[in-house]
Amino acid sequence: MRIFVPILALALLAGCSSTKKLAESLDTRQNSGACPAAGSLYDAARIVDFASGSQDENIYTNIAYTGEITDVRTFCRYTADHPLEAEVEVDFAFGKGPAAAGASHDFGYWVAVTRRSGKVLAKEHYTVQAAFKSGSKLAGTTERVNRITIPRADETIAGSNFEIIVGFDLSDEQLAFNREGKRFRLDAGQ
């Protein structure tokens, strides 16, 4: 028993820093204001990858893969004059077209923090993998981006002054395709 007590005391002391973090995470004070609005940029919310060399012919049989951002959710925490800490969940839907070469495909996407006026404050790039089960042409996943930190000048600056925007990394041709209103949905009619 005498050996057990010092070991227990050492374990408790070693855990002090993590105990402080746990106590901070259990803070029950209300946020100083609303969380930033979150969503996908309309022109960058979907992507159609055509088979190599077929970009000139935007027809269904040349589609390799498609992707769409279907939902974006933000969770945040901030009190007093502390920075706003947020995380974002992004739901993706994917399609595998007739010209697909494999059972998986990587898509690049970005997450940006902007002022409500549209000025981009920060932008990070990520990759999401579309993994298609055997025989399936549809897939989906949810990606979580943790620890988005938005500094605030003082406690009067609320999360509603910012937006968190998500979109696919698009080539000039893919962006033009989207802006022309063209789209192929591999799940249409299913």
Kindly label every feature range from the protein language model.
Residues 17-20:
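Bacterial signal peptide processing site
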Residues 26, 32, 121-190:
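Helix-rich interaction surfaces within compact, conserved domain-sized segments
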Residues 71, 76-123:
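Mid-length scaffold segments of soluble, non-membrane domains
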